[in-house]
């Protein structure tokens, strides 16, 4: 990997505090799991007043695990599962609901890359080479979500370059707090305009 340059227009991060879902219709809100609610909250904050189509990328190590565990219990106890519960247990259900809510018709990807889910999803979002909303959310080890509005016209200039020196990985919160983000594949750091 040489280097990729892009801009970050906005970052929204939450560990479960200040989840605002008031703009979501009640019927849709009821369909969201815990991880879906926190993801939807950060995506809505990042997306803001944008309108029209935008690429979407969602990443999660465990996805809708909470819902899957519930379905397994239902199957064990009643020998059947809720069709609605089943349909919302898929990995891309949250990003699908977001696209419905915001009337987005462009494609979206849902990434599960184990412990590298965040870095794989962010790389996928950057590789779109156009305005993209990226969201990572999980609820197993800790409840958290980060959404990033990637742009090529507006925002803070960022460079993604290969981690050829094999620097040790850190958490994306380092980048949020002004440092750089390091994962096994790449390094993400701010660049001069």
Per-segment meaning from a language model:
Residues 1-193:
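Conserved "HGTGT" condensation-loop signature of ketosynthase/thiolase-family condensing enzymes
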